[in-house]
Amino acid sequence: KADLGKGNEYTFAVALDRTACREGHIEIVGAGPGDPDLISIRGRQMLEKADLILYAGSLVPKELTLCAKAGATVRSSADMNLEEQFALMKEFYDKGLFVVRLHTGDPCIYGAIQEQMNYFDQYGMDYHITPGISSFQAAAAALYSQFTIPEKVQTIILTRGEGRTPMPEKEQLHKLAQSQSTMCIFLSAG
């Protein structure tokens, strides 16, 4: 019963359709820089409730998946192509289950999520992104360093060196360095 004012009480009835199925959901989770202690609280919560955890086995430590609930499917994507990954996620999604796609670092920085989001959008699949701590942040902490210093440098450039994927001409490292900003260079060891 609810009182809608002026002493009038009303009773509301709610009917639930037992045949209705729960909609699936996909959570793209940033695993952080590799230390299981550095995953976000929300990221860990998503892992704990997932029915499927699909993680980048060549990059994400398996220890991050140890918090999976009993009965959850935990699978490395290292030996899967994109079509196989999508098929597995869609299979769980179509059953109304909760899927976590676990990526390294922050999935929005040099991640491979754009193709996945395009796929999810194409099939009308509900998804969300849980950011992660990026390796550049962990590196600063490990080095007891600060990337910005008042009146010295207030800009941070996140970039990568040229490799198999060429850099746009205007983003060549020597041109970016001319700004004398702090530069965090990803994917360039070796």
Per-range role (PLM):
Residues K1, A13-G30, I41-I133, A138:
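Class I S-adenosyl-L-methionine
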Residues K1-I26, V99, D126-H128, S134-G190:
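Beta-strand/loop-alpha-helix module characteristic of Rossmann-like adenine-cofactor folds
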Residues I28-L38, G163-R164:
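Short, glycine-rich nucleotide/cofactor-binding loops
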Residues G32-P36, G105, S181:
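Generic anion/oxyanion-binding catalytic loop in active/binding sites
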Residues D37-R42, E169:
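Short, acidic/polar
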